[in-house]
């Protein structure tokens, strides 16, 4: 019997897989790649919410676990995909500068916000009010990470490339059977695909579509990330990733004319040089209304667990949440209250009246 059957091979799925493997547990992943958000993610990690000058939930702990996780995976796969790089916030007024300095005085933000103005001028970026520097930042090349991790899984017969059908779950006394696979636990790490999961679709996952560009701008001489209303991330060879939009209504992955226009307008607010769009792509982020993840065990079926709702911060959240869920399952350590799906217990009770599956017992 397997220890863990993991549904989904995005950031959440591989984060849990890696934690399980590190603890000598047997795993198998199932994924048909119907969800794209991890693969097209910007990949930035940043401990500060720059719009509101507030600390990301549990940022210090997440950064430690994240760096340990990516160091280990880079070592294992012999590939570099975690790039530590400063993020500069471009200021548009003296007032924005003042807000920055006020925020950097706060005890929880002090480790993350530099108190020195960055006055350096970058070719093709107009910056009369200079920049503030966020510390402990960078980006993960998520597409490369997922591609190489998938190769590793396939080489070790740890990945089934097929759609998962929850109708085929049968419940055993000490786990589940799925088709010809027996496992102690299932981890659902499906991203926005959770809406089709009859065991957890009562949870308020509200996908937010994001669109991004890769642009070519030979005259933009930038070796760090600039963040304003969008981020500009250097990829080498005069290529830059730019994003992202937020659309709460469109739940498709397809790039749109509306998203394209919004990105074009925002880029032109920041850079003054010519550029061409090399690629335009989109994905639906798994976001939750209260901006907290979805982590926990099903109220009735104790072999079913969820790891979802990583939203816009998957590269930072994934490793820490995977560890928290693993510790909960194996060592009965309580899940942080803010992330535990028990906060939606009333929604679960309401769902019992409608469509929660009864489950088959073998």
Predicted regions and their residues:
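Active-site substrate-recognition segment that forms the wall
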Residues: 14-23, 44, 49, 80-82, ...
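Helix-loop-beta segment of a Rossmann-like dinucleotide-binding subdomain
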Residues: 51, 55, 79-89, 115-148, ...
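C-terminal catalytic lobe of FAD-dependent flavoproteins
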Residues: 279-362
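Glycine-rich FAD pyrophosphate-binding loop
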Residues: 21-40
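Dinucleotide-binding Rossmann-like beta1-alpha1 core, especially the glycine-rich loop
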Residues: 44-123
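Conserved beta-strand-loop-beta-strand element in the redox core of flavoprotein oxidoreductases
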Residues: 164-181, 186
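Short hydrophobic core segments
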Residues: 5-7, 181-193, 322
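Beta1/beta-strand and adjacent pyrophosphate-binding region of the FAD-binding site
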Residues: 1-12
